[in-house]
């Protein structure tokens, strides 16, 4: 959703003798304005539906609640149209965004950039304006989150336009096993996620060969990589039937993989993401042509990552000052790498944990609370 920006106050008249603005300066001012406006527009994202999700409030579903879609921050015009048509889907779009954000923060919890969110509709701040491999991962995991949420909502009967999976019986399923049950509707989840998530990119028009057109292609590719990862990791789940658990009969269905498995797979793709550039035909090609071309499940990026060591308002980097680090680790979570060589401070803190747990018949576990003083380290 675009933010309104006042260009000129009513009291300013162009072309009057009292105006000190020359035509040349005016053109320059407009150029700056539209550049700024572009940044503001790009700052909005549907990811904001995953932050304190407003569409979970019951009052938005009252009859005639059409204003809901126009009031949701971050939606493009195409996404607002889909919102009007499928209002019952919006809660699960928000859940998918939230799932993606949480998984991003888990996967990057020990990295200099830890998927921190900011308090506005951009969700991740200005860092997403850079076509880096971190941006690539974020687009992929959020698109994957929507497929995950929509597929499960169909299975649970929460949506009026879909139900249980209609996936064909796998050819390698044993003949005496039944194919049925109520599986996650991954086909529907994939299709709707593609329609909704890609809508913003497909309605943007930029000159062929421009940086903006490269970002659109990058975003679309990574959205698809996230969706396909969910689709390809889905597997057959089965339940036994029979007397005393003999499992003489099995009923099987299609089931989503645990989303942590999706996050792990996308994190591996992040580590091997392909650097891309636009060719003369306006297509993305690899910077290093000696490598194999990325598949539809690989992540791609067009910009080098910014310096995440220090706070930088222009790139959106929050820096690592104040981040906890592991003194004994030689990995990215270690104080040497996390603190970028600046050193670290040590302090003591009290931790409380459950301990001495015992099982009582029947049927509960009772624990005591134990406290200990531990050393912690934070980057200078």
Curated annotation (Swiss-Prot):
**Where is it located?**
Secreted, Extracellular space, Extracellular matrix; Secreted
Propeptide segments, given as residue ranges = 36-61
Q: Which residues are connected by disulfide bridges in this protein? A: 104-115, 154-162, 164-182, 238-252, 240-247, 309-340, 325-335, 339-379, 355-370, 357-367, 362-363
Say which domain of life the source belongs to: Eukaryota
Q: Give me the residues lipidated as O-palmitoleoyl serine.
A: 244
- What modifications does the entry list under PTM / processing? Glycosylation is necessary for secretion but not for activity.
Where does the secretion signal sit in this chain? 1-35
Where are glycans found on this sequence? 114, 120, 312, 326
- Gene induction: In cartilage and cultured chondrocytes, induced by interleukin IL1B.
- Pfam annotation, one family: wnt
Q: Which family does it belong to?
A: Belongs to the Wnt family.
Role according to the record = Ligand for members of the frizzled family of seven transmembrane receptors. Can activate or inhibit canonical Wnt signaling, depending on receptor context. In the presence of FZD4, activates beta-catenin signaling. In the presence of ROR2, inhibits the canonical Wnt pathway by promoting beta-catenin degradation through a GSK3-independent pathway which involves down-regulation of beta-catenin-induced reporter gene expression. Suppression of the canonical pathway allows chondrogenesis to occur. Inhibits tumor formation. Stimulates cell migration.
Subunit structure comment from the entry: Forms a soluble 1:1 complex with AFM; this prevents oligomerization and is required for prolonged biological activity. The complex with AFM may represent the physiological form in body fluids. Homooligomer; disulfide-linked, leading to inactivation (in vitro). Interacts with PORCN. Interacts with WLS. Interacts with glypican GCP3. Interacts with PKD1 (via extracellular domain). Interacts with TMEM67.
Q: What is this protein called?
A: Protein Wnt-5a
Instruction: Specify the species.
Output: Oryctolagus cuniculus (Rabbit)
Q: Which gene encodes it?
A: WNT5A
């Amino acid at each position: 959703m675009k933010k309104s920006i006042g260009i000129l106050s009513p009291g300013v008249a162009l072309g009057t003798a009292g105006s000190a603005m020359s035509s040349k300066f005016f053109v320059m001012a407009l150029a700056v304005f539209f550049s700024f406006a572009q940044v503001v527009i790009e700052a909005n994202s549907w990811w904001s539906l995953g932050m304190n999700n407003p569409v979970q409030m019951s009052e938005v579903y009252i009859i005639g609640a059409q204003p809901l879609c126009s009031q949701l921050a971050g939606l493009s015009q195409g996404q607002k149209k889909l919102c009007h048509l499928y209002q019952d889907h919006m809660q699960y779009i928000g859940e998918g965004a939230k799932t993606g954000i949480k998984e991003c923060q888990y996967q990057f919890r020990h990295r200099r950039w830890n998927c921190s969110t900011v308090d506005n509709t951009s969700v991740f701040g200005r860092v997403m304006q850079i076509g880096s491999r971190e941006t690539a991962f974020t687009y992929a995991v959020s698109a994957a989150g929507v497929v995950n949420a929509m597929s499960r909502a169909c299975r649970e009967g929460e949506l009026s336009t879909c139900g249980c999976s209609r996936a064909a019986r796998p050819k390698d399923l044993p003949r005496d096993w039944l194919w049925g049950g109520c599986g996650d509707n991954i086909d529907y989840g994939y299709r709707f996620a593609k329609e909704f998530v890609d809508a913003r990119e497909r309605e943007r028009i930029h000159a062929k060969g421009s940086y903006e057109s490269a970002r659109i292609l990058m975003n679309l590719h990574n959205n698809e990589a996230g969706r396909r990862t969910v689709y390809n990791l889905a597997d057959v789940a089965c339940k036994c039937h029979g007397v005393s658990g003999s499992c003489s009969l099995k009923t099987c269905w299609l089931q989503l993989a645990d989303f942590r498995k999706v996050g792990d797979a996308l994190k591996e793709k992040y580590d091997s993401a392909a650097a891309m550039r636009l060719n003369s035909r306006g297509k993305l090609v690899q910077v290093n042509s000696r490598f194999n071309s990325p598949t539809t499940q690989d992540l791609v990026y067009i910009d080098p990552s910014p310096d995440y060591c220090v706070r930088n308002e222009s790139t959106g980097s929050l820096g690592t000052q104040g981040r906890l680090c592991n003194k004994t680790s030689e990995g990215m979570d270690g104080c040497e790498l996390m603190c970028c060589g600046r050193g670290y401070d040590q302090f003591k803190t009290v931790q409380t944990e459950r301990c001495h747990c015992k099982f009582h018949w029947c049927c509960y576990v009772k624990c005591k609370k134990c406290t200990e003083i531990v050393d912690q380290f934070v980057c200078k």
